[in-house]
């Protein structure tokens, strides 16, 4: 009998302590802004930004099933998603928007020109009929407390936009595809706390690689993709003491490697006296494998 009482008491105490620890940890996470990349690259792009209770998706260039699996790993589902923000109408960014918009009934946000491009894209089998939501570049709007600004980005799509999202005291800049930086992009970069930015290719790998000439020229053009060097110089030029974390996105499988991108950008920052890991956290996002869940706050992420 005494043994039974002991184990029952021990179990009760353990359950109380476990609940308190879990509740305390969950409350801490609930009060934080979190970011996770589900995929980042020419084979598909999709990012989550929000809290442990709800969030938004930026682009949906992977299957709806894969997106849902990643959400469920975070304890979320489509019911917790307030909408999808689309950067442009290339297939690797919009593969699942038809399914998410018309079957899951998520609002799909973008400019009218981008929505027209989505409608013409044969890769989107389920056409958007009722889920389109339009915004105009340069006009701030709000989604569940997130203040969202958009600006034009140079890329060879129907239209391409970058996003600036202010939420929970943090400013997040998202530029996934960019052939040439512009003044508006640099203005927002100089005030952003957290940056998701393209580092698509190493120029030497591209020029010496197997791509045909026309494709190399397209990538290197002002409406193509941003190189590691351009990305590094852009960050160094606009770094400020409130910039905390930089996530390198849309790395090419054929013309880049995560270590190459990271080392190139770190070297450029170091040349300008900016210490990666101390002054700013920089990490490449993987093409297919989802990233860890990152908490975005006033602290620099420590690997």
Q: Residue locations for each model-derived region?
A:
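Metallo-beta-lactamase
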Residues: 112-162, 166-169
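Cap/insert and terminal regions of metallo-dependent hydrolase folds
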Residues: 183-283
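Metal-dependent catalytic neighborhoods of phosphoester/phosphodiester hydrolases
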Residues: 95-104, 120-121, 256-263
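Active-site environment of divalent metal-dependent phosphoester hydrolases
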Residues: 90-94, 116-117, 158, 181-183, ...
